[in-house]
């Protein structure tokens, strides 16, 4: 079948299992070919082809609400709802999103990008349905990794207590991004391999139904079956919560899927259908991935699966940070690394393998990761939490209440700080400055290159006190030479890279390379700018700011982050609080979410490019001369 001709999922109801198998193959071929060009979350999607098709065959979207947790596994859903023709633009600027989007299709009823939200959203939709006396099915689809998230467990507790009618799909592929960890994962493993319980339940029901008055006997046998399940399966977690359990179901068998889903619709109250799938199914490089490399990636060679490399000069920032921290940890057993299910993305797999006693993957549990680190710091350890900026948002209260308020020495490596590109608004790392800098004890830094990162990391562990956040971007470094011996860096001390007389430009991180290029262009036009590496976002360099105020020249701040509550706002507030008349111009992200696309195009949109910076600086210089 030409999947680009699909307009809506209604045609699925008339297809035989054999025809559905053919459609599965066509969709897999389409996805593998398209993602080889665009990149994307190919592994997760290849694993849920049959499951997604079965859901659309049994349920009636958009009347019935299909709620995809995280949302990166919705490519098949997008194809079945008429968006296959747009896959050439997947995750590209102004193109098809890699996640559900309300403005793309009426079939996308919930947006997500972070995990473990689907069950709470489903509970809300189901309650809205019941209160308004409407009639539709609510079907959240959540992975076994996401189900370990605290928010998902909170929702399960409420759903089971309230007996709210819904069908929960547990997509069990034994992985979130990396292999899953924890007691919940182990429980799923026991359920996965224990078909005896469900076979026994079915046999009892069938036997009793054939006897006179069998329905009454079947009802009275509930206690027997309850005892049986504890004998056969080591703990039926969901049924103890008040949620009926169906499974495990082969997630690549249309017959089993359809039977299970139809059964779930006939049961009153909440039901969980435990579906076993194979992440990456149908494409050997993805199917054989044991550590999560094929969860999400860039373009690759179709024939071999080899990921196409860019022309980067240095290692990735993530790799540099993890290698540097590991080099410290090898000599200092009080350093331990903690990550919330991101050992692959944060490049900690080598650390995990070589220093297993000092490494902790806590699963999709950002709040737990942060407070666990606080507990370690309170007892003499130097914990390092490697976490994406976007996921750190989920642990705000733990940062404030448990770490900062107690002034505990936890070092945070904030990965993917700034614009991240293709994953879009749910993943842009542009909010952390705003919510970290108002924490009284927090130090926030961002290095200009790898060598400075080395020195700042050393100082973070051995020179500074209290909580430390070191931001670093997605992508690769510059390949600069690293000093052999770390230097002390005075906390709050900025670095003047180039002196100038017309405008002072304050920035940090990779933006400084752009500003240095702008400086060269402006020198040709007779405009002299002072370029300052404001590597400490908090505390500010108050000595420099005081001296700058006396020079009576304008200040431009440039940040790949939100302006509200950001670095530039801190500069403006500082001068305002002191009643100093300093002209401060800020460039950054206005009060909006930044969608997906190439980072260079997104930077153009927010005005962080050579042409706009030259224009803004010249305007500042001219207005200052005229004043």
UniProtKB/Swiss-Prot annotation:
Its cofactor is Mg(2+); thiamine diphosphate. Keywords: Isoprene biosynthesis, Magnesium, Metal-binding, Thiamine biosynthesis, Thiamine pyrophosphate, Transferase. GO terms for molecular function: 1-deoxy-D-xylulose-5-phosphate synthase activity; magnesium ion binding; thiamine pyrophosphate binding. It holds the Pfam family Transketolase_C. Mg(2+) binds at residues 144, 173. The keyword Transferase applies. It catalyses: D-glyceraldehyde 3-phosphate + pyruvate + H(+) = 1-deoxy-D-xylulose 5-phosphate + CO2. Transmembrane segments: none annotated. InterPro entries: Dxylulose-5-P_synthase (IPR005477), THDP-binding (IPR029061), Transketo_C/PFOR_II (IPR009014), Transketolase-like_Pyr-bd (IPR005475), Transketolase_C (IPR033248), Transketolase_CS (IPR049557). Its EC number is 2.2.1.7. NCBIfam families: dxs (TIGR00204), PRK05444.2-2 (NF003933). Homodimer. Catalyzes the acyloin condensation reaction between C atoms 2 and 3 of pyruvate and glyceraldehyde 3-phosphate to yield 1-deoxy-D-xylulose-5-phosphate (DXP). Belongs to the transketolase family. DXPS subfamily. This is 1-deoxy-D-xylulose-5-phosphate synthase. It comes from Macrococcus caseolyticus (strain JCSC5402). The lineage of its organism: Bacteria, Bacillati, Bacillota, Bacilli, Bacillales. The gene is dxs.
């Amino acid at each position: 079948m030409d999947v680009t001709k699909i307009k809506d999922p209604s045609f699925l109801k008339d297809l035989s299992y054999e025809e559905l198998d053919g459609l599965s193959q066509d969709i897999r071929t389409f996805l593998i070919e398209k993602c080889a060009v665009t990149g994307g979350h190919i592994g997760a999607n290849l694993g849920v082809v049959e499951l997604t098709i079965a859901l659309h065959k049994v349920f009636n979207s958009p009347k019935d609400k299909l709620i995809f947790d995280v949302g990166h596994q919705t490519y098949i859903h997008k194809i079945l709802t008429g968006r296959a023709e747009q896959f050439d633009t997947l995750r590209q600027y102004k193109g098809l999103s890699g996640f559900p989007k309300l403005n793309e299709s009426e079939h996308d009823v919930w947006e997500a990008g972070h995990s473990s939200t689907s069950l709470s959203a489903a509970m809300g939709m189901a309650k809205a349905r019941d209160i308004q006396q409407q009639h539709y099915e609510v079907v959240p689809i959540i992975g076994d990794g996401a189900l370990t998230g605290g928010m998902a467990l909170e929702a399960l507790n409420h759903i089971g207590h309230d007996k709210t009618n819904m069908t929960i799909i547990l997509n069990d592929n034994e992985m979130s991004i990396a292999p899953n960890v924890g007691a919940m994962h182990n429980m799923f493993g026991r359920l996965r391999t224990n078909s005896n319980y469900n076979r026994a339940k079915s046999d009892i029901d069938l036997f009793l139904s054939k006897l006179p008055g069998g329905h009454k006997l079947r009802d009275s046998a509930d206690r027997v079956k309850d005892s049986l399940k504890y004998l056969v399966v080591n703990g039926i977690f969901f049924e103890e919560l008040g949620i009926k359990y169906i499974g495990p179901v082969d997630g690549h068998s249309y017959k089993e899927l359809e039977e299970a889903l139809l059964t779930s619709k006939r049961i009153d109250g909440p039901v969980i259908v435990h579906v076993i799938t194979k992440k990456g199914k149908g494409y050997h490089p993805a199917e054989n991935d044991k550590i999560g490399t094929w969860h999400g990636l860039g373009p690759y060679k179709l024939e071999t699966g080899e990921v196409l490399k860019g022309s980067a000069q240095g290692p990735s920032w993530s790799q540099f940070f993890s290698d540097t921290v590991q080099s410290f940890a090898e000599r200092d057993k009080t350093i331990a690394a903690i990550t919330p299910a991101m050992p692959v993305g944060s490049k900690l797999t080598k650390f995990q393998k070589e220093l297993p006693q000092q490494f902790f993957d806590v699963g999709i549990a950002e709040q737990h990761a942060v407070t666990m680190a606080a507990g370690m710091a309170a007892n003499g350890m130097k914990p390092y939490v490697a976490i994406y900026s976007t996921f750190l948002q989920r642990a705000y209260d733990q940062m404030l209440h448990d770490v900062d308020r107690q002034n505990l020495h936890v070092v945070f490596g904030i990965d993917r700080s700034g614009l991240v590109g293709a994953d879009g608004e749910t993943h842009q790392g542009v909010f952390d400055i705003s919510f970290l800098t108002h924490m009284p004890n927090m130090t926030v830094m961002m290095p200009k290159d790898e060598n400075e990162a080395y020195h700042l990391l050393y100082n973070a562990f051995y020179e500074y006190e209290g909580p430390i956040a070191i931001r670093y971007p997605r992508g690769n470094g510059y390949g600069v030479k690293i000093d052999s011996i770390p230097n002390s860096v005075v906390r709050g001390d900025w670095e003047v890279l180039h002196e100038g007389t017309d405008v002072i430009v304050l920035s940090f991180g990779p933006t400084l390379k752009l500003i240095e290029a702008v400086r060269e262009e402006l020198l040709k036009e007779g405009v002299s700018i002072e370029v300052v590496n404001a590597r400490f976002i908090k505390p500010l360099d108050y000595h420099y700011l005081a001296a700058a105020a006396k020079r009576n020249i304008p200040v431009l701040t440039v940040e790949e982050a939100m302006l509200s509550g950001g670095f530039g706002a801190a500069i403006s507030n500082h001068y305002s609080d002191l009643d100093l008349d300093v002209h401060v111009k800020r460039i950054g992200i206005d009060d909006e979410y930044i969608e997906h696309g190439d980072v260079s195009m997104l930077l153009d949109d927010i005005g962080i490019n050579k042409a706009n910076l030259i224009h803004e600086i010249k305007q500042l210089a001219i207005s200052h001369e005229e004043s």
